[in-house]
Amino acid sequence: MEPLPEPTSRPRLRPRPRCLLLLPLLLLLLLLLPAPELGPREARAEETDWVRLPSKCEVCKYVAVELKSAFEETGKTKEVIDTGYGILDRKASGVKYTKSDLRLIEVTETICKRLLDYSLHKERTGSNRFAKGMSETFETLHNLVHKGVKVVMDIPYELWNETSAEVADLKKQCDVLVEEFEEVIEDWYRNHQEEDLTQFLCANHVLKGKDTSCLAEQWSGKKGDTAALGGKKSKKKSSRAKASGGGSKQRKELGGIEGDPSPEEDEGIQKASPLTHSPPDEL
Protein backbone atom coordinates (compact mmCIF):
# COMPACT_ATOMS: atom_id res chain seq x y z
CA MET A 1 0.00 0.00 0.00
CA GLU A 2 1.45 3.25 -1.12
CA PRO A 3 1.79 6.03 1.43
CA LEU A 4 -0.43 9.05 1.01
CA PRO A 5 1.26 12.22 -0.23
CA GLU A 6 1.82 14.83 2.35
CA PRO A 7 -0.49 17.81 2.01
CA THR A 8 1.17 20.81 0.48
CA SER A 9 1.33 23.81 2.73
CA ARG A 10 -0.84 26.67 1.49
CA PRO A 11 0.69 30.15 1.53
CA ARG A 12 -0.71 32.22 4.35
CA LEU A 13 -2.65 35.31 3.20
CA ARG A 14 -1.47 38.54 4.64
CA PRO A 15 -4.20 40.55 6.38
CA ARG A 16 -5.22 43.69 4.54
CA PRO A 17 -4.37 46.98 6.17
CA ARG A 18 -7.25 48.59 8.00
CA CYS A 19 -6.96 51.78 5.95
CA LEU A 20 -7.78 49.84 2.77
CA LEU A 21 -10.84 48.35 4.42
CA LEU A 22 -12.11 51.74 5.54
CA LEU A 23 -11.59 53.44 2.17
CA PRO A 24 -14.79 52.14 0.48
CA LEU A 25 -16.77 53.11 3.57
CA LEU A 26 -15.41 56.67 3.46
CA LEU A 27 -16.23 57.00 -0.23
CA LEU A 28 -19.77 55.83 0.43
CA LEU A 29 -20.21 58.39 3.20
CA LEU A 30 -18.96 61.20 0.95
CA LEU A 31 -21.50 60.27 -1.70
CA LEU A 32 -24.34 60.23 0.83
CA LEU A 33 -23.48 63.58 2.40
CA PRO A 34 -25.59 66.53 1.09
CA ALA A 35 -23.84 69.18 -0.97
CA PRO A 36 -22.90 72.27 1.06
CA GLU A 37 -25.12 75.29 0.53
CA LEU A 38 -23.57 78.30 -1.14
CA GLY A 39 -23.27 81.45 0.89
CA PRO A 40 -24.03 84.92 -0.51
CA ARG A 41 -20.51 85.41 -1.84
CA GLU A 42 -20.31 81.97 -3.41
CA ALA A 43 -23.77 82.43 -4.90
CA ARG A 44 -22.68 85.71 -6.48
CA ALA A 45 -19.61 83.98 -7.89
CA GLU A 46 -21.87 81.40 -9.54
CA GLU A 47 -23.71 84.11 -11.44
CA THR A 48 -22.57 84.71 -14.95
CA ASP A 49 -21.50 88.03 -16.37
CA TRP A 50 -24.70 88.10 -18.40
CA VAL A 51 -27.06 87.82 -15.40
CA ARG A 52 -26.14 89.75 -12.25
CA LEU A 53 -29.02 89.79 -9.78
CA PRO A 54 -29.69 92.97 -7.78
CA SER A 55 -28.05 93.39 -4.39
CA LYS A 56 -29.99 94.19 -1.23
CA CYS A 57 -28.69 97.76 -1.43
CA GLU A 58 -30.07 98.16 -4.96
CA VAL A 59 -33.42 96.68 -3.96
CA CYS A 60 -33.85 98.97 -0.96
CA LYS A 61 -32.72 102.00 -2.96
CA TYR A 62 -35.42 101.61 -5.59
CA VAL A 63 -38.09 100.57 -3.09
CA ALA A 64 -37.43 103.88 -1.30
CA VAL A 65 -37.46 105.78 -4.61
CA GLU A 66 -40.85 104.35 -5.57
CA LEU A 67 -42.28 104.84 -2.08
CA LYS A 68 -41.33 108.53 -2.23
CA SER A 69 -42.89 108.86 -5.67
CA ALA A 70 -46.10 107.04 -4.64
CA PHE A 71 -46.54 109.11 -1.47
CA GLU A 72 -45.93 112.29 -3.46
CA GLU A 73 -48.56 111.32 -6.03
CA THR A 74 -51.17 110.42 -3.41
CA GLY A 75 -50.40 113.43 -1.22
CA LYS A 76 -51.91 116.04 -3.56
CA THR A 77 -55.54 115.21 -2.82
CA LYS A 78 -57.70 117.00 -0.25
CA GLU A 79 -60.09 114.08 0.13
CA VAL A 80 -61.49 113.39 3.60
CA ILE A 81 -62.51 109.87 4.61
CA ASP A 82 -65.71 109.66 6.65
CA THR A 83 -65.15 107.41 9.67
CA GLY A 84 -68.54 107.99 11.37
CA TYR A 85 -70.52 104.80 11.85
CA GLY A 86 -74.16 104.30 12.87
CA ILE A 87 -77.32 106.28 12.29
CA LEU A 88 -77.24 107.96 15.73
CA ASP A 89 -73.91 109.73 15.06
CA ARG A 90 -74.71 113.42 15.00
CA LYS A 91 -71.28 114.58 13.90
CA ALA A 92 -69.56 112.50 11.29
CA SER A 93 -65.84 112.36 12.07
CA GLY A 94 -63.43 112.42 9.18
CA VAL A 95 -59.74 111.77 8.52
CA LYS A 96 -57.69 113.32 5.76
CA TYR A 97 -56.70 110.76 3.16
CA THR A 98 -53.09 111.97 3.28
CA LYS A 99 -52.87 110.88 6.94
CA SER A 100 -55.04 107.79 6.74
CA ASP A 101 -54.19 104.11 7.03
CA LEU A 102 -55.89 103.57 3.68
CA ARG A 103 -53.24 105.60 1.88
CA LEU A 104 -50.43 103.64 3.54
CA ILE A 105 -52.04 100.30 2.67
CA GLU A 106 -52.71 101.24 -0.95
CA VAL A 107 -49.13 102.43 -1.47
CA THR A 108 -47.38 99.47 0.16
CA GLU A 109 -49.59 96.90 -1.59
CA THR A 110 -48.77 98.18 -5.07
CA ILE A 111 -45.22 99.47 -4.59
CA CYS A 112 -43.40 96.37 -5.84
CA LYS A 113 -45.44 96.22 -9.06
CA ARG A 114 -44.04 99.63 -9.96
CA LEU A 115 -40.56 98.09 -10.18
CA LEU A 116 -41.70 96.07 -13.20
CA ASP A 117 -41.66 99.37 -15.14
CA TYR A 118 -37.87 99.37 -14.83
CA SER A 119 -35.48 98.08 -17.48
CA LEU A 120 -31.94 96.80 -17.30
CA HIS A 121 -29.43 99.24 -18.80
CA LYS A 122 -26.30 97.13 -19.25
CA GLU A 123 -24.34 100.07 -20.59
CA ARG A 124 -24.47 101.69 -17.14
CA THR A 125 -22.52 100.79 -14.02
CA GLY A 126 -23.54 100.13 -10.42
CA SER A 127 -27.12 100.58 -9.29
CA ASN A 128 -27.75 102.97 -12.19
CA ARG A 129 -28.25 99.93 -14.43
CA PHE A 130 -31.85 99.89 -13.19
CA ALA A 131 -33.93 102.71 -14.68
CA LYS A 132 -37.27 103.32 -16.33
CA GLY A 133 -37.44 103.52 -20.09
CA MET A 134 -35.79 101.50 -22.82
CA SER A 135 -32.07 100.95 -22.52
CA GLU A 136 -29.72 102.64 -24.96
CA THR A 137 -28.64 99.26 -26.33
CA PHE A 138 -32.14 98.02 -27.15
CA GLU A 139 -33.18 101.42 -28.46
CA THR A 140 -30.33 101.23 -30.98
CA LEU A 141 -31.28 97.66 -31.93
CA HIS A 142 -34.94 98.61 -32.42
CA ASN A 143 -33.92 101.49 -34.69
CA LEU A 144 -31.79 99.12 -36.78
CA VAL A 145 -34.69 96.69 -37.14
CA HIS A 146 -37.06 99.49 -38.18
CA LYS A 147 -34.55 100.52 -40.84
CA GLY A 148 -34.60 97.01 -42.26
CA VAL A 149 -31.29 95.82 -40.84
CA LYS A 150 -31.24 92.13 -39.92
CA VAL A 151 -30.16 91.82 -36.28
CA VAL A 152 -29.16 88.33 -35.10
CA MET A 153 -29.23 87.78 -31.32
CA ASP A 154 -29.61 84.90 -28.89
CA ILE A 155 -32.84 86.51 -27.65
CA PRO A 156 -35.80 86.37 -30.09
CA TYR A 157 -37.18 89.73 -31.20
CA GLU A 158 -40.53 88.97 -29.52
CA LEU A 159 -38.80 88.81 -26.12
CA TRP A 160 -36.81 92.04 -26.40
CA ASN A 161 -39.40 93.98 -24.40
CA GLU A 162 -40.06 91.25 -21.84
CA THR A 163 -39.08 91.69 -18.19
CA SER A 164 -35.46 90.72 -17.63
CA ALA A 165 -34.35 88.23 -14.98
CA GLU A 166 -32.72 91.03 -12.99
CA VAL A 167 -35.88 93.17 -12.89
CA ALA A 168 -38.03 90.14 -12.02
CA ASP A 169 -35.71 89.39 -9.10
CA LEU A 170 -35.83 93.06 -8.10
CA LYS A 171 -39.59 92.79 -7.73
CA LYS A 172 -39.32 89.46 -5.90
CA GLN A 173 -36.86 90.84 -3.34
CA CYS A 174 -39.07 93.92 -2.95
CA ASP A 175 -42.00 91.74 -1.84
CA VAL A 176 -39.84 90.17 0.87
CA LEU A 177 -38.36 93.50 1.99
CA VAL A 178 -41.70 95.31 2.30
CA GLU A 179 -43.18 92.46 4.32
CA GLU A 180 -40.14 92.19 6.60
CA PHE A 181 -39.85 95.93 7.26
CA GLU A 182 -43.55 96.79 7.22
CA GLU A 183 -43.42 98.23 10.74
CA VAL A 184 -40.44 100.45 9.85
CA ILE A 185 -42.28 101.91 6.85
CA GLU A 186 -45.37 102.47 9.00
CA ASP A 187 -43.27 104.17 11.69
CA TRP A 188 -41.81 106.55 9.09
CA TYR A 189 -45.27 107.28 7.69
CA ARG A 190 -46.75 108.15 11.08
CA ASN A 191 -43.86 109.79 12.91
CA HIS A 192 -40.84 110.58 10.71
CA GLN A 193 -42.01 111.95 7.36
CA GLU A 194 -39.69 114.92 7.79
CA GLU A 195 -36.73 112.51 7.47
CA ASP A 196 -35.44 111.21 4.14
CA LEU A 197 -37.02 107.82 3.49
CA THR A 198 -33.90 106.34 1.88
CA GLN A 199 -31.82 107.22 4.93
CA PHE A 200 -34.49 106.11 7.41
CA LEU A 201 -35.45 102.81 5.76
CA CYS A 202 -32.26 101.68 4.04
CA ALA A 203 -29.29 103.16 5.88
CA ASN A 204 -30.79 103.01 9.39
CA HIS A 205 -32.62 99.67 9.20
CA VAL A 206 -32.40 97.43 6.12
CA LEU A 207 -28.68 97.95 5.47
CA LYS A 208 -27.57 98.76 9.00
CA GLY A 209 -23.94 97.64 9.33
CA LYS A 210 -23.83 96.60 5.65
CA ASP A 211 -22.66 98.14 2.39
CA THR A 212 -24.65 101.29 1.56
CA SER A 213 -22.46 102.66 -1.24
CA CYS A 214 -25.15 102.26 -3.91
CA LEU A 215 -27.43 104.74 -2.11
CA ALA A 216 -25.13 107.62 -3.08
CA GLU A 217 -24.85 106.63 -6.76
CA GLN A 218 -26.60 109.05 -9.11
CA TRP A 219 -27.02 108.96 -12.86
CA SER A 220 -25.92 112.22 -14.45
CA GLY A 221 -27.32 111.20 -17.83
CA LYS A 222 -26.02 111.49 -21.37
CA LYS A 223 -27.10 113.70 -24.22
CA GLY A 224 -30.09 112.09 -25.91
CA ASP A 225 -30.70 109.56 -23.13
CA THR A 226 -34.49 109.45 -22.98
CA ALA A 227 -34.55 107.19 -19.93
CA ALA A 228 -32.51 109.65 -17.89
CA LEU A 229 -34.09 112.87 -19.12
CA GLY A 230 -37.72 111.77 -18.87
CA GLY A 231 -39.89 114.79 -19.47
CA LYS A 232 -37.16 117.37 -19.82
CA LYS A 233 -37.37 117.40 -23.60
CA SER A 234 -41.07 118.18 -23.57
CA LYS A 235 -40.44 121.04 -21.18
CA LYS A 236 -37.86 122.49 -23.53
CA LYS A 237 -40.25 122.18 -26.44
CA SER A 238 -43.04 123.85 -24.52
CA SER A 239 -40.76 126.73 -23.50
CA ARG A 240 -39.71 127.21 -27.13
CA ALA A 241 -43.34 127.13 -28.21
CA LYS A 242 -44.17 129.78 -25.64
CA ALA A 243 -41.29 131.94 -26.86
CA SER A 244 -42.36 131.60 -30.48
CA GLY A 245 -45.97 132.25 -29.50
CA GLY A 246 -44.95 135.41 -27.66
CA GLY A 247 -42.95 136.57 -30.67
CA SER A 248 -45.87 136.06 -33.05
CA LYS A 249 -48.14 137.94 -30.65
CA GLN A 250 -45.75 140.89 -30.65
CA ARG A 251 -45.63 140.80 -34.45
CA LYS A 252 -49.42 140.96 -34.58
CA GLU A 253 -49.46 143.96 -32.28
CA LEU A 254 -46.75 145.69 -34.34
CA GLY A 255 -48.22 144.71 -37.69
CA GLY A 256 -48.10 148.31 -39.01
CA ILE A 257 -44.32 148.73 -38.60
CA GLU A 258 -42.26 148.69 -41.78
CA GLY A 259 -40.06 145.70 -42.37
CA ASP A 260 -42.35 143.35 -40.41
CA PRO A 261 -43.94 140.99 -42.95
CA SER A 262 -47.58 140.13 -42.65
CA PRO A 263 -48.73 136.54 -41.88
CA GLU A 264 -49.78 136.09 -45.51
CA GLU A 265 -46.31 137.02 -46.70
CA ASP A 266 -44.70 134.68 -44.15
CA GLU A 267 -46.94 131.87 -45.32
CA GLY A 268 -46.03 132.52 -48.93
CA ILE A 269 -42.32 132.49 -48.22
CA GLN A 270 -42.61 129.24 -46.25
CA LYS A 271 -44.51 127.53 -49.06
CA ALA A 272 -42.14 128.75 -51.75
CA SER A 273 -38.91 127.54 -50.12
CA PRO A 274 -39.50 125.40 -47.09
CA LEU A 275 -36.02 123.87 -46.90
CA THR A 276 -33.74 126.61 -48.30
CA HIS A 277 -31.85 129.47 -46.70
CA SER A 278 -31.27 132.94 -48.11
CA PRO A 279 -27.77 133.61 -49.41
CA PRO A 280 -25.55 135.78 -47.18
CA ASP A 281 -25.59 138.70 -49.63
CA GLU A 282 -29.38 138.93 -49.43
CA LEU A 283 -29.42 139.35 -45.65
UniProtKB/Swiss-Prot annotation:
Provide the Saposin B-type domain boundaries.
55-276
For this chain, the annotated S-S bridges are: none
Q: Report the leader peptide range.
A: 1-35
Which Pfam families is this protein grouped with?
A: DUF3456
Residue numbers spanned by region Disordered? 223-283
What are the GO BP annotations of this UniProt entry? innate immune response
Mind telling me which InterPro entries this protein's record contains? Answer: DUF3456
Where is the major localization of this protein? endoplasmic reticulum
Which residues does the record list as glycosylated? N161
Cellular localisation = Endoplasmic reticulum
Q: Determine if Plastid is one of this entry's keywords.
A: no
Q: Which keywords appear in this protein's UniProt record, sorted alphabetically?
A: Chaperone, Coiled coil, Endoplasmic reticulum, Glycoprotein, Immunity, Innate immunity, Signal
What are its GO cellular component terms? endoplasmic reticulum
Q: Name one GO molecular function term.
A: signaling receptor binding
- Residues folding into a coiled coil are 161-187
Question: What is the protein's known function?
Answer: Toll-like receptor (TLR)-specific co-chaperone for HSP90B1. Required for proper TLR folding, except that of TLR3, and hence controls TLR exit from the endoplasmic reticulum. Consequently, required for both innate and adaptive immune responses.
The record describes its quaternary structure and partners as:
Interacts with HSP90B1; this interaction is disrupted in the presence of ATP. Interacts with TLR1, TLR2, TLR4 and TLR9.
UniProt lists the family membership as follows:
Belongs to the canopy family.
Protein name per its UniProtKB record: Protein canopy homolog 3
Q: Which organism is it from?
A: Sus scrofa
Q: Which gene encodes it?
A: CNPY3
